[in-house]
Structure formats: structure tokens, C-alpha cells
């Protein structure tokens, strides 16, 4: 299971309140082993199947980012790479197999156009073309 720290805390029954106020401390970064059935997967998987819960980097860089880094192979690559996850929040990780730097910031205001003076909000026509090279 991979999710942000708040969602993971809620699913596992861990109090998420400390995540909502400074200094944004997680109760734990390594989650307990759980049965998949306890996560609502009874009848879908074997009754004794264990669920793997990906650990979080911190309060705003959760297990979903850990899972993404592992899936992308960034943790095994000698080249410096950039991993970006844009949603309500934006998490960015820069690094390679030897080091990783992670940060997070709210992305909603950027898409909503809050207090913009130039350009436009995220709407039809905001992006004219995207080229991958």
C-alpha cells in the first residue's frame, strides 16, 4: 500500500493530528505489518496475506513517493534524476543511488491561479504544446 502520510496514518488507525501542525512530526516512518484483510481486502486476497506498507520520507513526502522512486529505478541509477509527483501537493525528489533530496509544496494554488499577475490559470488553452526530447 502506498499513500501520503496522512492517508496511511488514517488507514492504519494512527492519529494523524501531529501531521497537521508545526513541526509536522509523524508518529512513525516505519509502519507495522498488517493483514490485507484488515485493510478491507477480505475475500479478494488470501485471508493471511500481509500488506506491504511503503515507508514515508516525512510528513509531506509519503510512501507513494517511496514507491514511485523504487518503481522508477531512481534509487539504483548513477545518473542524477528528477522525480515529480503533482497533485494537490507537489513532491519533488532529486538524486541518484548515492543521495536523494526531497521537498514538497502545495500545488493547488498554482493550478487555481491564486493571485497570479501574468499568464493564466490552469484551463483549456493554458498549455499550447508539449515536446519531449
PLM features per residue range, with description:
Residues 6-82:
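Nucleotide/phosphate-binding catalytic cleft detector across ATP-hydrolyzing
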Residues 1-4:
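Short glycine-rich phosphate-binding loop at a beta-alpha junction
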Residues 18-33, 67, 77-133:
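Glycine-rich phosphate-binding loop of actin/hexokinase-like ATP-binding domains
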